[in-house]
Amino acid sequence: MAAFVDTNILIYAFVGDIKGSTAKPATADSLIARLIQEDALIVSTQVLSEFSANAMRKGSPPLTVQQTSRLVKTFAAQTVLAVDASLVQLALQRVEQSRISYWDALIVEAAIRSGATILYTEDMHPGTRYGQLELRNPFL
């Protein structure tokens, strides 16, 4: 089953929890490893960009450019959905309909377009459905 993964899950898996918890990184790492093994990981260009920017400035120590680049190549071997103007328009409509933030709406619309049935995130309400897409928080 294909699953879209939000940026924060990748950050926990590969950078860790800047607050020092080990539970979230272990859970995120296990989830990402399973999805990659099953060839079921989906991300968007937005997720790759956010991951890259945050991975190189968060964590102790932050990831290097080379480490970040290797991880992006790993993710790119999976399914990567490009954010384009039509997706931005759909996200704007979603903001108006659902009253969620623009960035969350863009993630939701990318996940829907990708055909994913699950969106793993901790930033939105778990259990919420948008058509066939269900939001899940892997840490609950």
Model-identified regions with their sequence ranges:
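Short, well-structured N-terminal submotif of metal-dependent ribonuclease cores
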Residues: 1-43, 57-66
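Histidine- and aromatic-rich ligand-binding microenvironments
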Residues: 5-6, 44, 100-101, 123, ...
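Anionic group-transfer/hydrolysis microenvironments
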Residues: 8-10, 14, 46, 52, ...
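Generic alpha-helical structural signal
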Residues: 25-29, 69, 73, 89
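Active-site neighborhoods of divalent-metal-dependent phosphate/nucleic-acid chemistry enzymes
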Residues: 77-119
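Acidic, PIN/NYN-like endoribonuclease modules and their adjacent C-terminal/linker elements
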Residues: 108-140
